[in-house]
A protein has these predicted regions:
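Alpha/beta enzyme core
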Residues: 3-8, 18-43, 57, 61-65, ...
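Catalytic alpha/beta core domains of metabolic enzymes, predominantly
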Residues: 172, 178-296
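A mid-to-C-terminal "edge-of-domain" accessory segment
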Residues: 5-6, 12, 245-412, 450-453
Length: 509
């Protein structure tokens, strides 16, 4: 690989899976591996084969996929661990041993000399088996500097192809990382990787500092997954390199959001809304000043074009809303109120926001319809009937009958629960029509008790990036969820029609 490209070593399937609450099936690990390869990572750390038969089977299955990127396996500085990696038909081993005094004393109960010898033996064995070898001194940033240099020099002399510098408990800062990498470059003449944890929120900053100091590779995870506070986030690291430092990677940045969503879905770890690059709010605007600026020139309040990372910007009405933002939102639905009507709509939106209400597209359209004295949106999709079955030892199943422009369609699906099954059945029916994805689902109890009135809010998106929010309320959570989804679908369909009409008008003489 040309040195002008920074190497991306993705450890989502190993370190990322060590996130509390995450356990991936072999099938899901393969799905993520295929997506990571599509994204353009240079190396996938597929797992830690020695830990279990299931882990070994998953790594073997990933190795069988004939992916374009390199596939590595983790191994302690033990012959049996390295053998386990080879049993998976891998040609790349990432081997490690702890070198800090606290780890040596309390975990390994070894002397420095013993740890050094184990490191050398592991590298020599891996190379004798024809493997590509990357060596990590675990807890490197808390290891005595002179001893650390001695370890890395020794494994370099033993033949390791690369060394990796782990900031195992995220205890470093960029200045420390800078001096450390430069020190190590003075004793080894092989490529250096950096592996940072985010315990103090500095994982990405520390990784960038390492690259600036001469490292050529970073170990990262999708969505910053990992033990405790997680690892350096691939999407943040890559975009910072591209946009702030002018450094290249092989990553297809337009696939970052797609990859983030796939990993979030399969791991069950929700991405925080305000997370940089891939959080739901990263390209969302509610403030009137901001929406006005973005509509005039997106660079006023966006550092990058959202399409660079597979995103679309979106606007939301709220108590900070302004005339320009609300006007743009209504225009998506083909509504063009007069200036006086627009002022009244904005005033009513602000009143609702001041009362603490989260304003959906449905609320905005209801206000606009009232002020403009127009009927609501045409309901192109209506619920005719649906049935759900669930219980102990029963796979939740839903059958849904929809009327789409007065034609009847029926779909059935299974799910993790009755709501999941019902929403999947709706998506199955409407897939060819709109290819809708559920981006957000929120359930709130409006009243107390077991018969509480529940409110369901959803945000849906189609393949063209049209986004709509909707809500529904009722005593039955499943019915409310289904109705909210259908409301969202109708709004998407209306946006698509308006957009299509605009495109046709462009070519009308």
């Amino acid at each position: 690989m040309s040195e002008e490209y920074i190497r991306i070593y993705d450890t989502t399937l190993r370190d990322g899976e060590q996130t509390p609450g995450v356990t991936l099936t072999p099938q899901n690990k393969v799905k993520i591996a295929i997506q990571l390869d599509k994204l353009g990572v240079d190396v996938i750390e597929a797992g830690f084969p020695i830990v279990s038969e299931g882990e070994m089977d998953a790594v073997k299955e990933i190795a069988r996929q004939n992916l374009s990127c390199e596939i590595s396996g983790l191994a302690r500085a033990e012959k049996k661990d390295i053998d386990a990696v080879m049993k998976c038909d891998l040609k790349y081993v990432h081997t490690f041993i702890a070198t800090s005094d606290i780890h040596l004393k309390y975990k390994l109960k070894r002397t420095r000399e013993e740890a050094l010898q184990k490191a050398i033996e592991a590298v020599e064995y891996a190379k004798s088996q024809g493997l590509v070898c990357e060596f990590s001194a675990e807890d490197a940033t808390r290891t005595d500097r002179e001893f650390l240099k001695q370890v890395y020099k020794a494994v370099s002399d033993a033949g390791t192809d690369r060394i990796d510098v782990p900031d195992t408990v995220g205890y470093s800062n960029p200045q420390y990382i800078d001096t450390l990498i430069k020190d190590l470059k003075s004793v080894v003449n092989i490529p250096i990787s950096i592996h940072c944890h985010d315990d103090f929120g500095l994982a990405v900053s520390n990784s960038i500092a390492a690259i600036e100091a001469g490292a050529s590779c970073a170990h990262v995870t999708i969505n910053g997954l990992g033990e405790r506070a997680g690892n350096a986030s691939l999407e943040e690291f890559v975009m910072a390199l591209h946009c702030l430092y002018g450094k290249k990677t092989r990553i297809k940045t337009e696939l970052l959001y797609e990859t983030s969503r796939i990993v979030s879905s399969l791991t069950g770890i929700v991405v925080q809304p305000n997370k940089a690059i891939i959080g739901e709010n990263a390209f969302g605007h509610e403030s009137g000043i901001h929406t006005h600026g973005v509509l005039s020139n997106p660079l006023t309040y966006e550092p990058i074009n959202p399409e660079m990372v597979g995103r679309k910007r979106w606007l939301e009405a709220g108590k900070h809303a302004g005339i320009h933002g609300v006007s743009a939102m209504l225009e998506e639905y083909g509504l063009t109120p007069s200036q006086e009507q627009l002022k009244e709509i904005v005033s009513k939106v602000k009143d609702l926001g001041d009362k603490g209400k989260n304003i959906t597209d449905a609320d905005l359209l209801a206000i606009a319809s009232q002020v403009m004295r127009q009927e609501g949106l045409e309901q192109r999709i209506r619920l005719s009937d649906f049935v759900v079955t669930t219980g102990m030892n029963v796979v939740p199943t839903a059958s849904v009958r929809l009327l789409i422009e007065e034609k009847e369609f029926v779909g059935a699906e299974t799910g993790l629960g009755p709501v999941d099954a019902a929403l999947k059945a709706i998506q199955k029916i409407t897939d060819e029509l709109a290819n809708i994805k559920l981006r957000e689902f929120r359930l709130e109890s409006i009243t107390g008790g077991s018969d509480a009135l529940a409110e369901v809010s959803v945000k849906v998106e189609d393949k063209d990036g049209h986004v709509a929010s909707a809500r529904a309320a009722g005593e039955d959570i499943v019915i409310a969820s289904v109705q909210a989804m259908i409301n969202g679908l109708n709004r998407i369909m209306h946006k698509r029609t308006v957009n299509k009409d605009k495109e046709l008008r462009k070519y009308t003489v």
